Each structure stands twice: as structure tokens, then as C-alpha cells.
């Protein structure tokens, strides 16, 4: 089957992680609840930061963008899952699958790059506090975010275009929650060696480079904090980094569970890792960042009071 016929006629069946009607009902309500919590948490973070002038700083600017990315990410995948749980027709078109894959790759990459920029922000704030205002100027923050978006869009486009060169034949049944690059390559009947090599090489660069940068930044941060004589100032400095470290650990940990395995052993039933990476991480990020943050507590409290305040 050539590429033109494939794009016009083929479709995939997103069978999910269970074909039992009873389990699908349980999964529907579970994912719906998690989706609503994720949307509410990230929207509140964005509203709190945008409405409080005290939070108009580089750290919270990038946090608001991280929340927006997580919001977009779950909206790209979960609504289709919910429809499939309730429908007998679980088909997704070839174009729809590629579109979902494009946004999936782009948004995961964007999350990764924003986390790296946030690590740089913490490095400058703790290791070079006297230069923080100039080093993290509004113009530079916008430039860094624009670079993150640009690289993410290009990387998503690259992988999606590579997948259009793949020929699919036989049953196009995806025992998975959404269209994923590794899953689709498992369904290919053409030679995917070159595409897999490009995928691994570019993935290592896109994800391991920021991880290495974050690791180096935190080594410098820890060394600087250990030199602070005051115990209270040490605690304050550590607490400003703890939330970011928690999110980074959750992000890379779940990503590694899903993707750090050879293509031929990639499991279509690896449901726990998939749910962690696709749903739990975006849901937990707002809680991790607001858990011990007094400024965020205050801003969220003011937003909630305005939302529920009765008009006089």
C-alpha cells in the first residue's frame, strides 16, 4: 500500500488497555475524574499567577507555561480515551492519529525544555543572585520560551513526517490509550530501522541534553547552598528547588519507564507506566508546586475567594 492510499483509506483501532465493558466503565470514571482534577489544578495555577502581581517573576512565568502545556497535553489524549470507553466504534483516522502523535511529541518535548529553563532560573537565583534581574530579564524569558516552543514544534514535525514514510499492513489494532510512536512502529510492515535510529538519536539529544544541563545546574546549586552559613537561609534555598526537583523526577522517571526499552520488547500492555506518564504527571504538577509554596497558597486563596464570592 503506498503512502497516498494509506493516508486516504486506513484507520487504526484504539482498543485501550481493556476490552471488558465493566472495566471500561471503571476506567471511564477514573480518567474523567483525573482529567477534571488536572484541568482544575492547572487552570487555577495559571489564574493565580496571572492575577497576582507578586508572582510576575521568571519562575512563575515558566510555571504558568508549564501548566498550560500540561493542560494542552491531557486535552490532546484523554477526551478521545473517554469517547472510546463509551463507544463501540474505537476507530481513529490515519490523519487523526498523526495529529495526536504530533501534539503528544511536541508537548512532551516542550515540558522537558521548560523544566530545563526553570532549572537555569533557579541556578541564577541561588548562585548569581546579584545578576538575577539582568540575567533573567523579561525579554530573555520570552526568548527562552520562544526557543522552547520552536524546538518542540520542529521535533514533533520531524517525527510525524518520518512516520508518514512507514507502511502499515495487517490488523491496525492499538492496545494502548493513544497513538504513540513506538506503538505505531510496532504495527509497521516496512523496514523501520532507519526511523528507529533517528528516533533514538534525536530523542537522546532532545531529552538527555536538558537532563544533563539540569543535573549540572543542581550540582552548582547544592554546592552554593552548602556554603550558606545560616540554617534558615539554607532551608529557604532548598525549598525553592524542592518542587522543581520533584516534578523533574516524576517527569523523567515515568518517561524512562515507558521508553527506555528496545522497540521489539515495547509492551502494548504497559498500562501503569503509560497512565503515570500521560495522566498522573500533569495532574500532580500543580499540587507539587503549590504544596509548600506560601506565595502560591495566598494567590490561590485569593482566586478561590473571588470565584466563590457572592455578588453584593
UniProtKB/Swiss-Prot annotation:
Residue intervals annotated with topology Cytoplasmic: 50-57, 121-140, 221-237, 292-312
Similarity comment text for this entry: Belongs to the G-protein coupled receptor 1 family.
Cellular compartment(s): Cell membrane
Protein name (Swiss-Prot/TrEMBL): Olfactory receptor 1D5
Alphabetical list of InterPro entries matching this protein: GPCR_Rhodpsn, GPCR_Rhodpsn_7TM, Olfact_rcpt
Membrane-spanning ranges: 26-49, 58-79, 101-120, 141-158, 197-220, 238-260, 272-291
Keywords: Cell membrane, Disulfide bond, G-protein coupled receptor, Glycoprotein, Membrane, Olfaction, Receptor, Sensory transduction, Transducer, Transmembrane, Transmembrane helix
Recorded superkingdom: Eukaryota
Glycosylation-annotated residues: 5
Disulfide bonds: 97-189
Organism whose genome encodes this protein: Pan paniscus (Pygmy chimpanzee)
Entry GO terms, CC: plasma membrane
Membrane topology according to the record: Multi-pass membrane protein
Free-text function comment from the UniProt entry: Odorant receptor.
UniProt topological domain (Extracellular) ranges: 1-25, 80-100, 159-196, 261-271
A GO molecular-function annotation: olfactory receptor activity
Alphabetical list of Pfam families matching this protein: 7tm_4
Amino acid at each position: 500500500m503506498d503512502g497516498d492510499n494509506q493516508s486516504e483509506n486506513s484507520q487504526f483501532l484504539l482498543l485501550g488497555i481493556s476490552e471488558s465493558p465493566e472495566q471500561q466503565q471503571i476506567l471511564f470514571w477514573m480518567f474523567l475524574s483525573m482529567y477534571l482534577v488536572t484541568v482544575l489544578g492547572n487552570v487555577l495555577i495559571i489564574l493565580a499567577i496571572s492575577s497576582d502581581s507578586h508572582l510576575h517573576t521568571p519562575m512563575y512565568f515558566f510555571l504558568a507555561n508549564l501548566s498550560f502545556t500540561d493542560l494542552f497535553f491531557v486535552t490532546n489524549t484523554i477526551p478521545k480515551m473517554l469517547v472510546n470507553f463509551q463507544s463501540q466504534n474505537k476507530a481513529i483516522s490515519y490523519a487523526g492519529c498523526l495529529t495526536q502523535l504530533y501534539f503528544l511529541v511536541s508537548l512532551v518535548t516542550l515540558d522537558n525544555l521548560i523544566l530545563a529553563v526553570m532549572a537555569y532560573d533557579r541556578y541564577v537565583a541561588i548562585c548569581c543572585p546579584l545578576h538575577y534581574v539582568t540575567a533573567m530579564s523579561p525579554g530573555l524569558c520570552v526568548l527562552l520560551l520562544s526557543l522552547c516552543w520552536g524546538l518542540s514544534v520542529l521535533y514533533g514535525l520531524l517525527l510525524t513526517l518520518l512516520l508518514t514514510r512507514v507502511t502499515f499492513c495487517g490488523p491496525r489494532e492499538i492496545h494502548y490509550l493513544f497513538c504513540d510512536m513506538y506503538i505505531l512502529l510496532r504495527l509497521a510492515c516496512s523496514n523501520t530501522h532507519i526511523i528507529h535510529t533517528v528516533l533514538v538519536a534525536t530523542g537522546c539529544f532532545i531529552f538527555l541534553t536538558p537532563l544533563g544541563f539540569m543535573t549540572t545546574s543542581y550540582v552548582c546549586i547544592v554546592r552554593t547552598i552548602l556554603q550558606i552559613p545560616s540554617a534558615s537561609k539554607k532551608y529557604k534555598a532548598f525549598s525553592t528547588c524542592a518542587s522543581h526537583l520533584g516534578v523533574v523526577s516524576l517527569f523523567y522517571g515515568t518517561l524512562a519507564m515507558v521508553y527506555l526499552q528496545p522497540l521489539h520488547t515495547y509492551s502494548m500492555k504497559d498500562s501503569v507506566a503509560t497512565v503515570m506518564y500521560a495522566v498522573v504527571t500533569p495532574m500532580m504538577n500543580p499540587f507539587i508546586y503549590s504544596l509548600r509554596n506560601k506565595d502560591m497558597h495566598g494567590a490561590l486563596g485569593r482566586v478561590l475567594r473571588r470565584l466563590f464570592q457572592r455578588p453584593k
